[in-house]
Amino acid sequence: MGLKADSWIKKMSLEHGMISPFCEKQVGKNVISYGLSSYGYDIRVGSEFMLFDNKNALIDPKNFDPNNATKIDASKEGYFILPANAFALAHTIEYFKMPKDTLAICLGKSTYARCGIIVNVTPFEPEFEGYITIEISNTTNLPAKVYANEGIAQVVFLQGDEMCEQSYKDRGGKYQGQVGITLPKILK
C-alpha cells in the first residue's frame, strides 16, 4: 500500500473529480491553511455546525435524538465558537469521490491541536462519495474559535496493492452520497 503524492492527488482530482472543489496549491496567508500539500490535501470546514447540548441526558448512537444538537450558521461571522469541553459536527466544503483501490485517512491540523481542538474523521473508504462529516471536540476549559471556510484537517491517500473485492459503494454504505452534516445512522 503506497502513500500518494501531490501529482497523483492533483491528477485524480482534476481528471476524475476525486476532490471538488480542488485547490491546486496550499493557501495559507491569513487563514488556517488548506489545499494541496506534498503528500496530502488540507480540507476546509464549511460554515454550518451542529453543537451538542444537554437538552437530553443521554447520547445513544443507535437511536440518536436530533434534539441533542443545535444547528448554527457561522457564515456571517466567519467563525463558530465551540464552548469549553464541548463537541460539534460540521462538514467539508469539498466533495469526495474515492477510487476503488484507495483509502484515505484524515488527521486534524496541528494549528487546532495546539489549541486543544481535536478533529476526528473516520477513513474515507474505497468508492465512498459525498461530503465529509467532521467531528470537533474542544478539550480545554475555554471557549474556542473554529474558522469557517478555512483548513481543519489533512487527508492522506493510500492506494492498495490490489483491488478490493467489495467497496463501500458495493455494499451500500449508509453514509454514501451524504450532503451536509449527517447524524449517526444504524441500518435496520
Swiss-Prot record:
Lineage top rank: taxon: Bacteria
Described purpose of this protein according to its UniProt entry: Catalyzes the deamination of dCTP to dUTP.
PANTHER family hit by this protein: DCTP DEAMINASE
Residues that coordinate or bind dCTP: K109, S110, T111, Y112, A113, R114, Q154, Y168, Q178
EC numbers, comma separated: 3.5.4.13
Protein's recorded name: dCTP deaminase
Subunit structure: Homotrimer.
Record keywords, A-Z: Hydrolase, Nucleotide metabolism, Nucleotide-binding
Any one GO biological process: nucleobase-containing small molecule interconversion
GO molecular function: dCTP deaminase activity; nucleotide binding
Active site per the UniProt annotation: E135
Pfam families found in the cross-reference section: DCD
Cited InterPro entries: dCTP_deaminase, dUTPase-like_sf, dUTPase_trimeric
Catalytic activity as recorded in UniProt: dCTP + H2O + H(+) = dUTP + NH4(+)
Matches recorded under Gene3D superfamilies: 2.70.40.10
Similarity comment: Belongs to the dCTP deaminase family.
